[in-house]
């Protein structure tokens, strides 16, 4: 056995040990933990994924929010919204308007609309120029967060706002003074100061504030966020079972808040991020369900349950919530000039999530419509400047490969050649289309074009952003090879290609949505089923479901496998799970499209 195939076999065997193996003699119980809501048996590869984080950073660098110029640069006068919930944090002011603007700033800060939050804090300062915490709030939102490191142009305004807060703190309540003093640890006038050390110092200072005020839910939430900013998107060791760094303290702090206040929107938002890459993302589900109603005007918070819905296999709910998030953002854009960063990154993220949720549930119509909207939201000239944007720009081609007719795929316009990853996925879609048409020569030409891109493109810009672009391209090449072999009846060749693709897919780091659009194990299972190798088909489908819950494509294949095996109880249980998960074409997926 070749080393790569051996490693794949060992990985499969290790995974198989984590869930129920087929019963001896082919029997199977009605209850199956893969079909009935058990924790995930396998988490994605560890490490910081940061797809949204880097997408946001790229948008920030493309059109950064400029806080330093005079107030008109912030746009029209902000609106005091009535649809951002009721979270309140006393700001040491007797001015009701100042408190209202301050509360809006805090709400928007927890919703990651930091530029709009700054506008609110500035309005609070206008209403009460002696409100120390109103200046603290502005300094807070100009700092780093889990999606964006602190931008150089924000340093001056942050220090200025902090200095004003310090100037006013003598007359502020004690709690406010402690918060201001803690935030002072986060910033330095020295441009050479190490950001990681400043972030750690701030987190440590917030730990002391949290110890002084253990009953203050917002302070504990701010403390948790300070810890998260020291290791953004990297809270779990590989496998997702063991917390990493401050990960255990982050989770414990947020759970302490949510146990007594399960409606704190900031704590829910951060808790979703804290556990989504773990083996138990479902722990956040009850809170995620509440979040959209708590701040219905904050599109990003309306979207956030999708991070859990997708991980636990609730694709129908993920699709629906992202529609609501898009509507909330579009309403917000009509009333505010908006930060270009928010509009160019967070809003397309909602569209992307909607698209992949529709893909997983089999809703080709919704997926293709979202693909068009996503493509339009990401201009090629902007994407060309930032490699991190290319996986998202390329994603619509995978939607067409999955659902569109071959001729429709072949009619798609080619992307600019300088978008290497996008071009490779365009070639992938074309290879799939030609394979379906059984045009072997044309499919091989497209596969060779993918290989050529993999060999010749400059992948360094992608590596700098942490994007495994070369691995994505190689996955595309190998899957396309499998599709062609499958279409021409070479099932052994197809199985080998899919096994090779699985090996690469398993190495891709965690991000939501995933870097590769579907679990390739379902394709391997479909081939083994058509070969009559039923135990291997069952294993492939079950391994797929252990990684990607409630995947209707894999459930359809597994149900067909049990039917072929004569295992009626297992077939019934799987068919029920499939019926609940699938919301696409009533005929269901064809085996050769898995």
Segment roles from a protein language model:
Residues 4-22:
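Gram-negative bacterial Sec-dependent N-terminal signal peptides
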Residues 26-271, 276-284, 289-295, 312-319, ...:
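N-terminal alpha-helical interaction modules that lie
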Residues 110, 264, 269, 273, ...:
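Histidine-centered active-site/metal-ligand motif
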Residues 135, 309, 321, 485, ...:
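TPR/Sel1-like alpha-solenoid repeat signature
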Residues 137, 222, 270-271, 304, ...:
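Canonical tetratricopeptide repeat
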Residues 344-349, 468-476:
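Extended HEAT/HEAT-like alpha-solenoid repeat tracts in very large eukaryotic scaffold/adaptor proteins
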Residues 476, 495-545:
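Generic long, charged, amphipathic alpha-helical segments
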Residues 539-594:
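C-terminal non-catalytic interaction modules
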């Amino acid at each position: 056995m070749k080393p790569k195939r051996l490693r794949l076999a060992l990985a499969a065997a290790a995974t198989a040990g984590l869930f129920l193996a087929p019963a001896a003699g082919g029997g199977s119980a009605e209850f199956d933990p893969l079909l009935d809501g058990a924790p995930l048996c396998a988490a994605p590869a560890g490490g910081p994924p940061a797809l949204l984080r880097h997408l946001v950073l790229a948008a920030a660098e493309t059109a950064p929010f400029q806080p330093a110029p005079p107030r008109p640069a912030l746009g029209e006068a902000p609106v005091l919204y009535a649809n951002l919930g009721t979270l309140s944090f006393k700001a040491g002011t007797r001015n009701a308007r100042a408190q209202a603007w301050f509360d809006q700033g805090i709400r928007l800060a927890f919703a990651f609309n930091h530029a709009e939050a700054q506008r609110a804090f500035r309005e609070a300062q206008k209403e009460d120029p002696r409100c120390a915490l109103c200046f603290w709030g502005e300094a807070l939102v100009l700092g780093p967060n889990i999606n964006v490191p602190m931008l150089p142009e924000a340093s001056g305004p942050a220090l200025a706002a902090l200095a004003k807060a310090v100037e006013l703190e003598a007359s502020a309540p004690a709690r406010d003074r402690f918060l201001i003093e803690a935030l002072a640890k986060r910033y330095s006038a020295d441009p050479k100061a190490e950001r990681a050390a400043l972030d750690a110092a701030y987190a440590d200072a917030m730990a002391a504030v949290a110890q002084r005020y253990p009953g203050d839910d917002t302070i504990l939430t701010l403390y948790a966020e300070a810890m998260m900013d020291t290791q953004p998107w990297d809270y779990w060791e590989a496998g997702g079972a063991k917390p990493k760094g401050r990960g255990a303290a982050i989770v414990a702090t947020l759970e302490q808040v949510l146990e007594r206040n399960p409606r704190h929107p900031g704590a829910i938002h951060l808790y979703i991020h804290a556990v989504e890459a773990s083996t138990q993302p479902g722990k956040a589900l009850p809170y995620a369900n509440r979040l959209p109603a708590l701040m219905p005007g904050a599109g990003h918070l309306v979207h956030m349950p999708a991070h859990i819905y997708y991980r636990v296999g609730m694709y129908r709910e993920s699709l629906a919530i992202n529609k609501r998030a898009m509507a909330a953002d579009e309403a917000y854009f009509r009333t505010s000039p908006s930060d270009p960063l928010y509009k160019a990154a967070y809003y397309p993220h909602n569209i992307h999530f909607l698209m992949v949720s529709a893909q997983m549930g089999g809703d080709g119509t919704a997926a293709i419509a979202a693909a068009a909207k996503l493509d339009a939201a990401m201009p090629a000239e902007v994407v060309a400047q930032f490699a991190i944007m290319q996986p998202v720009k390329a994603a619509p081609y995978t939607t067409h490969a999955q659902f569109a007719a071959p001729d429709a795929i072949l009619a798609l316009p080619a992307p600019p050649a300088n978008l290497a990853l996008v071009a490779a996925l365009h070639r992938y879609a074309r290879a799939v289309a030609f394979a379906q048409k059984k045009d072997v020569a044309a499919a091989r030409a497209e596969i060779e074009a993918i290989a050529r891109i993999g060999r010749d493109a400059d992948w360094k810009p992608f590596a700098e952003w942490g994007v495994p672009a070369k691995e994505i391209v190689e996955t595309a090449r190998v899957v396309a090879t499998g599709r062609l072999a499958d279409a021409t009846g070479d099932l052994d060749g197809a199985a080998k290609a899919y096994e090779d693709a699985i090996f690469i897919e398993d190495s891709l780091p965690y991000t939501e949505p995933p870097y590769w659009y579907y679990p390739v194990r379902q394709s391997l299972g479909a081939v083994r089923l058509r070969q009559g190798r039923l135990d291997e088909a069952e294993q492939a489908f079950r391994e797929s479901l252990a990684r990607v819950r409630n995947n209707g494509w894999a459930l359809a294949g597994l149900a067909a496998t049990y039917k072929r095996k004569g295992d009626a109880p297992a077939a019934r249980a799987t068919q029920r799970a499939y019926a609940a998960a699938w919301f696409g074409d009533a005929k269901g997926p064809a085996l050769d499209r898995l």
